[in-house]
Amino acid sequence: MTDVQAALELIKRGAEELLVEAELVEKLESDRPLRVKAGFDPTAPDLHLGHTVLLNKLRHFQELGHQVMFLVGDFTAMIGDPSGKNATRPPLSREQILENARTYQEQVFKILDPDKTEICFNSSWMESLGTAGMIRLASRYTVARMLERDDFAKRYAGGQAIAIHEFLYPLCQGYDSVAMRADVELGGTDQKFNLLVGRELQKHDRQAPQCVLMMPLLEGLDGVNKMSKSLGNYIGITEAPREIFGKIMSISDSLMWRYFDLLSFHPAVEIARYRAEVEGGRNPRELKVLLAQEIVARFHSHAAAEDALADFEARFQRGVLPDDIPEVNVVVGDGGLPVFQVVKQAGLTGSTSEALRMIEQGAVRLNGERVEDKGLVLQRDQTVVLQVGKRKFASVVLN
């Protein structure tokens, strides 16, 4: 395998789509550091693991010797990215944006090498563009082209409002690539239209068009929806080590492999070996421990990871749980099953009303943590430990 082939294999690991691969190969063969861009609008103060999918890929480019440009979209955050949205997003204040941007810079260097990272703010060129420049930029795209975007098309067809400033967002993101002379831009699959606008604007400016690497959107703890703070299915990178560790241990066995592919720095061949070992009978919980330790160590320290493991074992394995916990199978189906129904079907209560009452009294624990939300839905393909009161336990296989 040549150096370029090996580099391409690492770059494509976990990626959903690469446009255009032949162009990227040509850039890699030029034997110069590529300018690799990824933009983050500081719309919330903290990053979660879903954001780190792009950061991890940026780290891969750094390991290959390329220059990473971490773009803080302080200007575009005032517009609000309409990608995947069915309504106009409320704008943030300048003060909110700047404070969020400050915390982003503190957090990204838990993954990125600061010596190989260029922090950029798109206000530095967008604000100097001026009204005349913005009009010239807007003239390069038509309303018809904008309505090719799926989210805009759906809103237009449904009679929902689309504000004029929302059309400016993909143009501004695309212009960032012109200003930064990007060779490669990374983004989520929901960003495809915006990323391709960057290629078009670069061509218009007589630049070589950037290659576009799209990464999948990371599923949250429920294994169904995109990781999101609004859905409560996220793992924040500033959370306590114990919280991060426990949340990773709670994911389904099938979701574990997705997290390994997108969040772990373990080599692909090693992950393939883990899969084979699980198929051969190894307990997947052992591998979740490896993953949880790796993630905690990345955002805290190796010592914190060891402490989190010790805490987890103390709560779930060493003397806290009886040795003879019965194992029961509960069919939950594709849509999951509310926790109170799982409690009842596991035989831990005589009725669903009793299960609900026990949850309200704080007497139900899931993997050692008190269940606060009686509407919590458990997904299939995982094994959980349920406890009701002090003496009732069950290891529940959800399928």
From Swiss-Prot:
Q: Which GO terms describe its molecular function?
A: ATP binding; RNA binding; tyrosine-tRNA ligase activity
Where is this chain's protein located in or outside the cell? Cytoplasm
Q: Where does ATP bind?
A: 229
Give any Pfam family that matches. tRNA-synt_1b
What EC class is this? ligase
- Transmembrane segments in this chain: where? none
GO (cellular component) term, any one? cytosol
Q: Where is the S4 RNA-binding domain?
A: 337-398
Q: Which domain of life is it from?
A: Bacteria
| Primary localization class, coarse | cytoplasm
Query: Where is the short sequence motif 'HIGH' region located?
Result: 42-51
Enzyme Commission code:
6.1.1.1
According to the UniProt entry, where does the motif 'KMSKS' region sit in this chain? Answer: 226-230
Keywords from the named record: Aminoacyl-tRNA synthetase, ATP-binding, Cytoplasm, Ligase, Nucleotide-binding, Protein biosynthesis, RNA-binding
Subunit (UniProt): Homodimer.
So what does this one do?
Catalyzes the attachment of tyrosine to tRNA(Tyr) in a two-step reaction: tyrosine is first activated by ATP to form Tyr-AMP and then transferred to the acceptor end of tRNA(Tyr).
Q: Which HAMAP family match?
A: Tyr_tRNA_synth_type2
What is the name of the protein in this document? Tyrosine--tRNA ligase
Originating species: Aromatoleum aromaticum (strain DSM 19018 / LMG 30748 / EbN1)
